[in-house]
């Protein structure tokens, strides 16, 4: 009998491991989680509740930009928005907990609702008991990454979780962090909260994974359509409280010049770090890499810890790619590899195609990337053919009153294989699924039908396909 302990069973990664191993012949499974209520970050404080509140802001944004509508502009009722968000997310979290508890009803499966700590290599303490395991799966998620900024301890700040619970907001704000959370919540604070915001951007533009035109499009969209100012190539130096209860952030630019911004409230959207605190890894051979904000290497692609073949680390906690679909797939890989390792078989390495979506522009103008960007394809040595189209090139986007944005398709000029796609426009989040199929199957652009129903937004894909096909056939 092989005993597997899963720490963090309520989350997406941990529950994926549990679901795969529960009922497996010869496996004893102990699931542990101290969540109250449990349900995982995505459901409780991440991707699901954020879409709840963004949708309220999106409706107002679209009404504000449609001059065919008359009468007063509706306001977003923040209290009602938060109440509905809470009702729905608690329901979704309840389904996750019930699924885990149902697994624990199976023979050979136990659930312990308590904090888990390593006692030694493969002994875990939880619920006043010690469990000796053959394999331990760590799926403890992530926590807010609070930057080491002088003066930060002297001022009040709000994180993304605080924003999702906010029934009232001040007039002005300073934002540190313009990654996924910042790009989603900044327009929400502006549109739904009526705030005037200054957002610090360290680079020339946001969305470092995208080709430059997409980050430039986001900058233009936010500064032209929301009450948002985004100083670029700008770095925080220190922060201090103001006499009236606000905050003053001192910054320095790449050219050496300095400035100071003041606002009523500071918002920290500065990312998340692996949730390792209190886990007791110091009692094991496992030594995580120092956190830098970059992808980490202390966990192999087999999902085994670099320092211990019998400890598997999945989801946000491994510091690789903090996305739900990746966490689940890593969980499936870990479960499979535990069984393979136990019987002495070769292990499978987890590989995934780049597939990211940012719900920028309140989700009205989301950014998505599947596979390569033009830049990454060229860096990988491909001779590429590239097509770029503005959303406004296709009449349907104008007809639907969503004319902003663009899309790009990248193919291998030699054999026509579609290498990647990027979109920052209406329905780009939906089209990402189509491109996932195309890219992961390695389809030849010349074999893709260029016929969407007219008039529908995927006509932008037809144009990209035609242009790349012509380039390959030259």
Give, region by region, the residue ranges found by the protein language model.
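Glycine-rich flavin
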Residues: 2, 9, 16, 20-147, ...
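Flexible, glycine-rich terminal cap/loop adjacent to redox cofactors
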Residues: 2-12, 16-37, 41, 46-48, ...
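Short hydrophobic core segments
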Residues: 5-7, 116-117, 130-142, 175-176, ...
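Hydrophobic Val/Ile/Leu positions in short beta-strands of Rossmann-like dinucleotide-binding domains
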Residues: 6-7, 31, 174-175, 199, ...
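Rossmann-like dinucleotide-binding cores of NAD(P)H-dependent redox enzymes
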Residues: 170-172, 180, 184-248, 327, ...
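Active-site lid/adjacent beta-loop-alpha segment flanking the redox-cofactor pocket in flavoenzymes
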Residues: 213, 292-383
């Amino acid at each position: 009998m092989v005993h597997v302990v899963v720490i963090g069973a309520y989350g997406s990664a941990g529950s994926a491991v549990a679901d795969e191993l529960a009922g497996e012949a010869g496996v004893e499974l102990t699931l542990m989680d101290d969540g109250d209520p449990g349900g995982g970050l995505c459901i409780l404080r991440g991707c699901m509740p954020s879409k709840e509140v963004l949708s309220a802001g999106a409706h107002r944004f679209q009404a504000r930009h449609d001059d065919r509508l008359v009468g007063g502009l509706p306001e977003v009722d923040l209290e009602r928005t938060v109440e509905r968000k809470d009702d729905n997310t608690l329901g979704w979290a309840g389904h996750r907990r019930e699924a885990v508890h149902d697994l624990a009803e199976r023979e050979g499966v136990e659930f312990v609702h308590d904090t888990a700590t390593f006692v030694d290599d493969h002994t875990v303490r939880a619920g006043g008991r010690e469990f000796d395991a053959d394999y331990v799966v760590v799926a403890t998620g992530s926590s807010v990454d609070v930057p080491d900024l002088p003066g930060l301890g002297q001022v009040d700040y709000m994180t993304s979780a605080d924003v999702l619970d906010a029934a009232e907001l001040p007039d002005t704000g300073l934002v540190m962090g313009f990654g996924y959370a910042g790009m989603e919540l900044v327009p929400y604070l502006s549109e739904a909260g009526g705030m005037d915001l200054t957002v610090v951007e360290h680079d020339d533009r946001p969305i470092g994974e995208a080709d430059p035109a997409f980050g430039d499009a986001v900058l233009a969209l936010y500064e032209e359509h929301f009450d948002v100012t985004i100083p670029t190539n700008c770095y925080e130096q220190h922060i201090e409280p103001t006499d009236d209860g606000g905050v003053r952030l001192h910054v320095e630019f790449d050219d050496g010049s300095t400035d100071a911004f003041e606002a009523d409230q500071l918002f920290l959207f500065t990312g998340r770090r692996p949730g390792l605190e209190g886990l007791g890894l110091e009692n094991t051979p496992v030594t995580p890499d120092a956190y830098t904000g970059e992808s980490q290497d202390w966990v192999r692609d087999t999902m085994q810890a670099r320092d211990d073949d019998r400890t598997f680390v999945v989801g946000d906690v491994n510091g690789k790619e903090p996305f739900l679909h990746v966490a689940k797939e890593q969980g499936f890989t870990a479960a499979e590899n535990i069984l393979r390792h136990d019987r002495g078989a070769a292990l499978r390495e987890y590989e995934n195609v780049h597939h990211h979506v940012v719900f920028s522009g309140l989700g009205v103008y989301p950014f998505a990337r599947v596979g390569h960007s033009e830049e990454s394809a060229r860096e990988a040595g491909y001779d590429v053919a590239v097509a770029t189209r503005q959303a406004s090139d296709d009449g349907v986007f104008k007809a639907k009153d969503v004319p902003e944005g663009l899309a790009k398709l990248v193919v291998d000029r030699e054999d026509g294989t579609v290498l990647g796609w990027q979109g920052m426009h209406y329905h780009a989040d939906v089209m990402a699924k189509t491109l996932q199929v195309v890219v992961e199957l390695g389809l030849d652009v010349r074999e893709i039908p260029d016929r969407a129903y007219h008039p529908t937004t995927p006509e932008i894909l037809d144009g990209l396909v035609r242009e790349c096909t012509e380039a390959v056939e030259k």
